[in-house]
Amino acid sequence: MSMLKVENLSVHYGMIQAVRDVSFEVNEGEVVSLIGANGAGKTSILRSISGLVRPSAGKIEFLGQEIQKVPAQKIVAAGLSQVPEGRHVFPGLTVMENLEMGAFLKKDREENQANVKKVFSRFPRLEERKNQDAATLSGGEQQMLAMGRALMSTPKLLLLDEPSMGLAPIFIQEIFDIIQDIQKQGTTVLLIEQNANKALAIADRGYVLETGKVVLTGTGKELLASEEVRKAYLGG
């Protein structure tokens, strides 16, 4: 079943076209990876899906409903959350307060408390540091906090924008392991990532973007085996 369907999406910033007639879909239960170099349009696509950027053309369907003109907070309420590039945690708030910000649309206190327990179960470091300001966390821990904050809204679809960017190698594999665990627990994932090798290794399917256009698609294994992808993104 298709959870997200993007058809003929275009995004402009003034006279600059960042996304050109892009179409793809994400089926329920999948991890789908979008890979491409800087400037390929990946982040603009995610921002359009999450309601932060209004596309200039095209259609975005989430759970059968068009959302390209829906306000961002209503998209979150419908079951879609994004972890932005660069994490963007609230540095002056504690870990717990950051998590509570992720549940701002949910009024059921018991449900929120249960979700905090789930986040701490998945990210034990966050429980150890729950009363610390987010600014005191390492980059990897801040990424875990950003992911935990997004999961507080119990999304059906999680959008991840460059989750391994700027992280120490010890944290990178842990983040990708966590993404797989999130999928196993029933959350569908759309992943944008410059680390094409790791992104495709965990992906059910992938799309390759160049200068705002989809130029190649296939299963994660097919794209990893593609000579074109290896030369452009995998160093060989």
Outline where the language-model segments fall.
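ABC-type ATPase nucleotide-binding domains, specifically the catalytic core motifs of the NBD
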Residues: G14, V32, V70, V95-A114, ...
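The feature captures the beta-strand-to-loop junction immediately N-terminal to the Walker
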Residues: I35-A37
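Helix-to-loop junction immediately C-terminal to a conserved catalytic motif
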Residues: S50
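Conserved ABC transporter NBD signature motif
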Residues: G58-E66, A78, E111-V116
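Conserved ABC ATPase signature
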Residues: D133-L137, E141
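ABC ATPase C-loop
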Residues: A150-L151
